[in-house]
Amino acid sequence: MKEIVEQNIFNEDLSQLLYSFIDSKETFSFAESTILHYVVFGGENLDVATRLGAGIEILILSSDIMDDLEDEDNHHALWMKINRSESLNAALSLYTVGLTSIYSLNNNPLIFKYVLKYVNEAMQGQHDDITNKSKTEDESLEVIRLKCGSLIALANVAGVLLATGEYNETVERYSYYKGIIAQISGDYYVLLSGNRSDIEKNKHTLIYLYLKRLFNDASEDLLYLISHKDLYYKSLLDKEKFQEKLIKAGVTQYISVLLEIYKQKCISAIEQLNLDKEKKELIKECLLSYTKGDTRCKT
């Protein structure tokens, strides 16, 4: 990733800032998923696949930075500790560098076409998330599909395109499912951690929209808590009791059922791939071994 920045950014101060952002990354799961899909679909040039993965990781990093700036959270991140205008400019620089790197591979014009498609979808999903467009759970799931699923589809479909030269709709489909799995799992654990951005901005998360249906007294009480910030933060001091409230309101069961539904959708789609059983199992292991507590869209 640093090599790509070095090749495209001549401003030394900006380069050093971008290097520090890259160094702060703890995982490179999108690049890993790109390379995995490239290999299982028959690709053999790992050098090219690695360069594609690095370009995609740069795009994801730019997306993470812009997401944090827009949501005004993740305050421990380096880009949230400096002037916001400087961070925004750095994010746009990374975005441009990432696209330039992918375009320069010049292997298949379809790769760049689909990268732009998924980036465009993710931005529109992010817009709907910021503006609280979702009024129903189905609308929220569609926003999640666009905002999160599109980025995972970007990594996986690009890897397949590099290997085969052809777009694979099945890969796109299960990538969207994976995005939904990652986000709804993250939303649940963020609720337990007291993410101030979601609460302060009264975000129309899937859980919030579920609670608004007021299935029982417990869901009404929980919605009241979330709508009154001081009471919500105070209730989080006793995590065990708060978790009991989530169970009584049906939130825990609701999220568990949704996770299982989309997990099975993901598995079913993977089984439709024209690949050996061992390769299908490898994809399942990669996609479905997400970590509890993940709050971002991860592969």
Swiss-Prot record:
Disruption phenotype: Disruption of the gene prevents the development of competence as well as the transcription of comG, a late competence operon. Disruption also decreases the expression of srfA, a regulatory operon needed for the expression of competence. Changing D67E: Loss of activity. Cannot complement the null mutant. One of its GO terms (cellular component) is plasma membrane. It is an enzyme of class 2 (transferase). The DNA sequences encoding comQ, comX and the N-terminal two-thirds of comP show a striking polymorphism, which determines the specificity of the quorum-sensing system in the different pherotypes of Bacillus. The keyword Hydrolase does not apply. It comes from Bacillus subtilis (strain 168). Part of a major quorum-sensing system that regulates the development of genetic competence. Involved in the maturation of the competence pheromone ComX. Acts by catalyzing the transfer of a farnesyl group on the ComX pheromone. Shows weak geranylation activity with geranyl diphosphate (GPP). Its main location: membrane. Pfam families: polyprenyl_synt. GO terms for biological process: establishment of competence for transformation; isoprenoid biosynthetic process. It is found in: Cell membrane. Mg(2+) 2 binds at D67, D71. Its cofactor is Mg(2+). Keywords: Cell membrane, Competence, Magnesium, Membrane, Metal-binding, Prenyltransferase, Transferase. Changing S63F: Reduces the farnesylation activity using FPP as the prenyl donor, but geranylation activity using GPP is comparable to that of the wild-type enzyme. GO terms for molecular function: metal ion binding; prenyltransferase activity. This is Tryptophan prenyltransferase ComQ. Coiled coil: none annotated. Belongs to the FPP/GGPP synthase family. Binds 2 Mg(2+) ions per subunit. It catalyses: L-tryptophyl-[protein] + (2E,6E)-farnesyl diphosphate = (2S,3R)-3-farnesyl-2,3-dihydro-2,N(alpha)-cyclo-L-tryptophyl-[protein] + diphosphate. It comes from the Bacteria. Its EC number is 2.5.1.-. Induction: Expression is maximal early in growth and declines as the cells approach the stationary phase. Mg(2+) 1 binds at D67, D71. The keyword Ribosomal protein does not apply.
